[in-house]
Each structure stands twice: as structure tokens, then as C-alpha cells.
């Protein structure tokens, strides 16, 4: 490959299908303040396949939804009596989400509790007194949404996740890893016994590898029950670190004999500095973390998203959900002036790709000591349309980037759009000369392009 060519696309080499299930989010149109801010159409435009329900009470203030303690507030009561559940707010939230085009990925348990680092000051992350009783409560929730129980629904909710980040500390689980492993197995066995067709797993670890992870998987192996999926998280500014997480999880699962257990990375986000997103951070650290091109939800973050999503298409990863928690704020898609941020447009870019195209084609990226180019080529199901998505992460200095293309001789370019520090999916010029495609950069920072073609009639 010529030294000035960043990657080569071969549209004659179909390498399989795109996986749209990797394009999910932890957010949805909000239920609180819905009369003031209806965001259904904006979320539809992102084409997320899944919406994971973790932390939803935190950005729907005043609403008792999703978390077990909101749906079943008095844990000593009978979990087989429908009168002891409060489903109404969750019913509405799930309806809104599904009508916005997303499937539900339901996290059972509690949202994170940031009020203290002391176990005796927590309320919702305490270890349940009776694991079997708690499992019956969770069975009631699943039954309501999948079997129509308690004036419920027959939704096709496939994924049910047990807990979230238990090894993080008391803000998520106040017990030991041994207690959690026993709790996880108890709930897993109870739910699979009544609902064999759903997928039950978890527990949304902060990383795929570690002592807690081994303890939970060993407990499952000892109990002779495999989780249907294994979920974990990652926050970083290194695309390659996040792209290889599924491989690490896959190898761990296989080592325990869980070769059929799926892998899910269902919280992930660009992270410059954890301290800079807290209210106690010095102002200069907040500015470094949040503002400018390298900011938390700005162009570096947006192109990072695309680099990861492109890279994952060749990894052993069944599902993923971006953290995206609520539409506004530090982890959202809008800034304090309600302008859609760069991450919103990056998710829209990838959503358009996986919703309109089916097949992925061969791409050979030029080796580089520090990889900054991530690229994917795609074809529609009928092969009448083609697309190229390019992410230039952390910005090559070149004013232009060139790519070799093969197999598009009978296609014409119908649209090209750029996402960079100043433009949000704006139309742009591309130069196609023979079998070479060249795109221009407006500045040396991160940028991404979505270029679409249609077959000449």
C-alpha cells in the first residue's frame, strides 16, 4: 500500500454482516419533564438498538422507576402479591423508550448511590437479607413485563442484567465478593427456572478481569449454571484498550467453560480525567476535562466513539451500550444551552450506518506506530448502496487523507458529510480520482466522514 494511502477498501470482499446490537445506549427520552422536553424524534435519529436501564432514576427526578426499591419498596412483603408492586412509572418509561425505537436491556437491582463511601450511610446498595426472597421480587418484575402478570405486558425483553459494578465499592454493593457471588447465582437460577427463554446475566463489572470476576464465574461453574451474558465496562481515551476488552472477556469465559455466554460492554465512554467530572474538582481541571476539542463530549470524544464502534465490528462482542446516561449534563448529548454535542452527532453517524447497511467489506488500514485511522466499508442488503465511515482519532497532521477503493467502479458518490471541531455532519467535498478517494481536513484535530454511494442505473 502506498505510504500516503491511509486505508484500502475492497467492496468485492464481503466479510460478514454488521452488528447493530453493538450500538446501544444507557439513555432514552426522559420521562420527567416530558411535557417540557420531548426528545423522541432526536433519539429515533440515533438508531440505538438497545437502551440499558441503569441509573434511569437519577435523570428522571421525582419518578419511582426501574430500581427494585422503587418497584417493590417494602421488601418484607409477599412478592407473589401484585398489590405490593408499583409498576406505573416504569411502565410509562419502557413504553416511551420502545416507541422511540429502542429495545430494553433491563438492569435489575439499584442505580449507583453516590451519597457516601461508608456502608452504614447507604440505603439501596445494602446486601439483601434474604437472597431467595429478593430473587422472587425480581421474578415478579420479569413476569410483569414478559408474561402480562399484574396487569402487565408481553414485551419481548431479551436481556435481564443482575446488578451493576458490585466490585466498585459501597456505592454499588455493601457486601463481600463471596456474598455477591452467592447472590448472583441465586438470582440467575431463580429467573432461568421460570423464564428459560430470556437471557439473564451480568453483573456489569467495571472491568472484565479480576478477583470478583473470577469469584462470580467460579460460583456459576460450581452451581452448574452458565450466565447467558457477561457484562463489563470501560472508560478510557485509548480506543485500542476498549476495542480489546471483548477479547479479554471472551478468553476469561472460555477458560471457565462458558463458551456460549455472550459478551456485553454496556457502559463505555471517552474519559480524559475522572476527577474533572466531579463537582469538587478545581476549575482549571474541569475546563481541561470538559472544554475545548479534547473535552468530555467534544470532537475528540466523538471520534473516539466512532473509532471504538468501528473496531468492535471485528471483535467477539454481542451487545454494547454507550454511557449516555440521560440526555443532558456531563454524560449526556446536550450542553447547558441545550445544544446537541459532538457525541450526539457521532452516535447519529454510526446509527445511520448500521440502520441502512447490512454487510461489512474488507478494509486494510496502513500500519502505524500510533493508530489514528479507523475505517469501515458497508453495503446495503440489495448491494445497491455503499458507504464508507472514516474516523481520524487524535488527528493526523495532514491536510488531506487518501484511501484506496476497489469495487465501486459502477457506483457514484451521492453524499459526503464531515464531523469535526466546527462542523456537525455538514456536507463536504470529496475527491475521487480513479480508485483513490481523498477527504480534506479543516484543522489538524480529530475528524470523521460518512460517505455514501449508490449504484449507477
Model-assigned labels for residue ranges:
Residues 5-12, 34-39, 88-92, 145-148, ...:
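Alpha-helical scaffolding within the catalytic cores
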Residues 46-239:
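Substrate-binding cleft and catalytic face of glycoside hydrolase catalytic domains
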Residues 177-305, 315:
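Noncatalytic carbohydrate-binding groove/subsite architecture in carbohydrate-active enzymes
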Residues 368-410, 416, 421, 446-452:
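Carbohydrate-binding surface patches
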Amino acid at each position: 500500500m502506498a505510504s500516503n494511502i491511509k486505508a484500502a477498501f475492497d467492496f468485492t470482499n464481503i466479510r460478514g454482516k454488521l452488528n447493530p446490537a453493538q450500538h446501544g445506549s444507557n439513555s432514552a427520552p426522559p420521562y420527567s419533564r416530558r411535557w417540557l422536553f420531548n426528545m423522541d424524534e432526536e433519539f429515533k435519529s440515533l438508531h440505538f438498538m438497545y437502551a440499558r436501564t441503569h441509573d434511569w432514576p437519577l435523570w428522571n427526578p421525582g419518578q419511582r422507576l426501574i430500581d427494585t426499591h422503587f418497584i417493590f419498596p417494602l421488601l418484607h412483603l409477599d412478592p407473589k402479591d401484585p398489590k405490593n408492586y408499583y409498576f406505573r412509572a416504569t411502565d410509562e418509561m419502557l413504553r416511551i423508550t420502545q416507541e422511540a425505537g429502542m429495545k430494553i436491556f433491563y438492569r435489575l437491582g439499584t442505580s449507583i448511590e453516590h451519597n457516601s463511601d461508608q456502608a452504614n450511610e447507604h440505603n439501596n446498595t445494602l446486601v439483601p437479607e434474604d437472597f431467595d426472597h429478593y430473587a422472587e421480587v425480581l421474578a415478579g418484575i420479569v413476569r410483569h413485563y414478559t408474561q402480562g402478570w399484574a396487569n402487565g405486558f408481553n414485551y419481548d425483553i431479551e436481556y435481564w442484567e443482575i446488578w451493576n459494578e458490585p466490585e466498585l465499592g459501597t456505592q454499588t454493593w455493601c457486601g463481600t465478593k463471596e456474598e455477591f457471588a452467592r447472590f448472583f447465582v441465586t438470582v440467575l437460577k431463580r429467573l432461568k427456572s421460570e423464564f428459560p427463554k430470556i437471557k439473564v446475566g451480568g453483573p456489569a463489572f467495571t472491568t472484565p478481569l479480576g478477583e470478583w470476576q473470577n469469584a462470580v464465574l467460579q460460583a456459576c461453574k460450581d452451581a452448574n449454571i452458565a450466565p447467558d451474558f457477561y457484562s463489563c465496562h470501560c472508560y478510557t481515551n485509548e480506543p485500542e484498550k476498549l476495542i480489546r476488552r471483548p477479547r479479554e472477556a471472551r478468553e476469561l469465559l472460555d477458560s471457565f467453560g462458558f463458551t456460549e455466554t455472550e459478551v456485553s460492554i454496556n457502559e463505555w465512554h471517552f474519559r480524559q480525567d475522572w476527577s474533572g467530572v466531579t463537582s469538587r474538582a478545581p476549575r482549571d481541571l474541569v475546563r481541561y476535562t470538559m472544554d475545548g476539542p479534547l473535552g468530555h463530549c467534544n470532537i475528540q470524544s466523538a471520534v473516539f466513539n466512532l473509532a471504538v464502534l468501528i473496531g468492535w465490528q471485528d471483535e467477539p462482542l454481542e451487545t454494547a451500550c454507550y454511557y449516555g446516561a440521560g440526555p443532558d449534563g456531563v454524560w449526556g448529548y446536550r450542553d447547558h444551552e441545550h445544544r446537541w454535542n459532538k457525541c450526539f452527532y457521532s452516535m447519529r453517524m454510526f446509527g445511520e450506518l448500521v440502520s441502512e447497511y447490512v454487510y461489512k467489506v474488507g478494509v486494510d488500514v496502513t500500519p502505524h506506530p500510533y493508530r489514528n485511522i479507523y475505517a469501515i466499508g458497508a453495503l446495503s442488503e440489495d448491494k445497491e448502496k455503499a458507504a464508507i465511515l472514516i474516523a481520524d482519532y487524535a488527528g493526523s497532521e495532514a491536510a488531506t487523507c487518501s484511501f484506496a477503493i476497489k469495487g465501486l467502479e459502477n457506483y457514484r458518490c451521492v453524499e459526503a458529510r464531515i464531523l469535526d471541531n466546527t462542523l456537525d455532519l455538514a456536507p463536504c467535498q470529496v475527491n475521487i480520482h480513479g480508485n483513490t478517494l481523498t477527504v480534506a481536513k479543516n484543522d489538524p484535530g480529530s475528524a470523521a466522514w460518512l460517505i455514501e454511494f449508490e449504484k449507477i442505473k
